[in-house]
Amino acid sequence: MATSKAENEVSVINVVVKAVRVYSTGDNVRYRVQFDSPFQGYAKDMNGDYNLTEIDYIDFVPSVLIAQCLNIVEGLDILYTKKKEAGLRSNGVTGFGAAELQAVLRNAKMQLERKHFSAGEEYVTSDGEVRTHEHDGYSTSIVDIRVTERVQTKLDDMLDKMLEI
């Protein structure tokens, strides 16, 4: 298990992706990335309280996970654009989501940076809005992704086909 760092200190965790799942929180959709080994994190108990424990997953807002992966995995942006355009042209019938991420990320080596935050600390949203954390937790950034050789070969082949004249 990765060790926890002091508050606001960044910890680095190296893991292998086992699965990407999708679930609903009632109002929103989230992607849960499950890893091969546990590390410290906060999980909600039966009473709705968040407790520090060992976890083997991280939940992401879909757009955040997709954006981080697009910025790191070479060729994934082309697959995303092709699927997104197909979705737009078919009135949203197809698109890019958890299934595509599962296909690309399964067995990928991933390096995460995690920063601890405490309840009551302020943070700024992507819209520039200042908010306050309601409970202790970690903010997580994906620093590096090494997809399997098979996946990278497929992405490279797709790029080669796009560049053929």
Task: Please place each PLM-identified region on the residue numbering.
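N-terminal acidic, proline/glycine-rich, low-complexity intrinsically disordered segments
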Residues: 1-5
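Structural detector for short beta-strands of small beta-barrel domains
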Residues: 14-17
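Short aromatic-glycine-enriched beta-strand elements
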Residues: 29-31
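Acidic, low-complexity, intrinsically disordered interaction modules
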Residues: 39-148, 153
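Short acidic DE-rich linear segments
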Residues: 160-165
